[in-house]
Amino acid sequence: MQIPLSTFEKKFLSLYFLIFSIIPLHATEMVFDRGIASINIEFANTLNLRKQGLMKRAKLNQDSGMLFIWPEKEQQCMWMKDTSIPLSLAFLKDDGMILEIFYLEPFSKSSVCSSNEVRFALEVNRGWFREIM
């Protein structure tokens, strides 16, 4: 299910992060119009890491997420095959601004695709964005 964002939220709801980190887990801060939230990000910046994603994990720490990085900007699609954790997914612009957020259902094989061409997506525990915004 897609969470609608108002024009105000799309304009001011920004996420800043280090994009090309060689460290697989990196603590970073996300800047929103209502304040700053810290999150530990795992980077999925290779084909194998993007394919694996968060599959076959029992849990995801509340302050953690996975940033998917594709080499080219295009419409991206995600699914929840073999993923038991309820997640929220944000597709991001190059500058980190959140374009759209979706709720993902565990084990779903239905694809959720970005409405725009993107290079980045962030998966976190379901409801995390709502809690910090």
Name each model-derived stretch:
Residues 12-22:
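Bacterial N-terminal signal peptides
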